[in-house]
Amino acid sequence: MLPLTQAAWALSAREAGLIQSAFHLGYLISLFMVGFIADHFGAKRAYLTTGIAACASPWAFVLLADGFWSAFWLHALTGLCQGGTYTPALALINDHVERARRGRAMGYLIAGSSAGYAICLGVAGLALKFTDWRGALAAVAMLPVTSWLLGIYVLRSTANTVHPRPAGESLLASIPAVWRNRRGMLSIWGYSFHNWELLGLWAWLPAFLTAALLAHGENPQSAATLALWFAALSYVANIAGSIVGGTMADRWGRTQTILTWSCVSLALSFSIGWLISLPLALLVALACLYNFAGIADSSTHSTVLAESVPPHYLGVAYAIRSVVGFGAGVVSPVVFGWALDLAGEGAGWGIAWSTLGLGAALGPIVTWKLHRGAR
């Protein structure tokens, strides 16, 4: 959808990146707040309550966005409301799934998120055949309601657990406790470098595929529609990547899994932008591999953090991770767009994608320290 709104509102690549980042900014604020809520009121209650806002918020963007500033703030509002279910879902898994199966369970959660993202892109691509970009977004905005109702059904017999804190300890005392937890903080930093790459990838892949289609002679409307379909196909690879990564983490180790897949995705960050002129089938295949590798270690980062801190401040640990990790995800799409604007045609895409690799390159180093500390 980005190329169509970019053309409709005459946005630069930097402005388009800022709108993408606005969602992540709202999302990280939401994750920070809901981490405390989940610790205080219980993960199930937090999940179902914040889901109401997640159902309502997309409609504000659909009905009111009409230019850079309105799109920026309304997309931030959407992110603010959408983030409320993520941390409680992680906490629910930690509460109700045994350690030996926790990595795979986290993988299925991330796979479900990826499936939802792929379905959204597929629905948007189909809707664009019959309506404009605003109508397509309206079709997508109907999907969170289905998810929320499904959540009510699935969690109907699940207990709402509130972990007791030590006597006299306030909820805010958990913040310095997390900062002093070396293993927990290494996990948070590793996740942050991972997010720099992954959220930049998700923000810019449809636009990149649109540019590739335009270079192959497609008209703008057709290119945007096909790019959404191709991007949706590549996000289906996220589903497999999440499950494979989570299963590997249970069988062969948490940090080994993170190291393996972070190195594969780094190689693709530094190469895919220079390969825009490849045959489309091969380029889409690389995009699928990129998404597979980029998310294969995501659930494992969440599992490592859950196993590194006491359960009574796990929500706060996820909240701190949200500020640091999604803060990186706010910045990376902007840096990508800035690099694309500066470099222009030709080498622009190669340089822009390489900014994701540069930001993520510290991830394997942090994970190696985490691995050595666990031995």
Placement of each model-derived feature along the sequence:
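Residue-level signature of mid-helix packing/kink "hotspots" within the transmembrane helices
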Residues: 24-32, 117-118, 235-243, 330
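Conserved MFS/SLC helix-loop-helix module at the cytosolic interface between two early adjacent transmembrane helices
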Residues: 29-66
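Structural signature of the two symmetry-related core transmembrane helices
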Residues: 45-59, 256-271
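Cytoplasmic helix-loop-helix junction between adjacent transmembrane helices
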Residues: 74-112
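Helix-loop-helix hairpin linking two adjacent transmembrane segments in secondary transporters
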Residues: 109-155
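Multi-pass alpha-helical transporter architecture, strongest
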Residues: 149-154, 354-375
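Flexible cytoplasmic inter-helical loops of multi-pass small-molecule transporters
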Residues: 152-176
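Extracytoplasmic gate region of multi-pass secondary transporters
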Residues: 184-235, 239
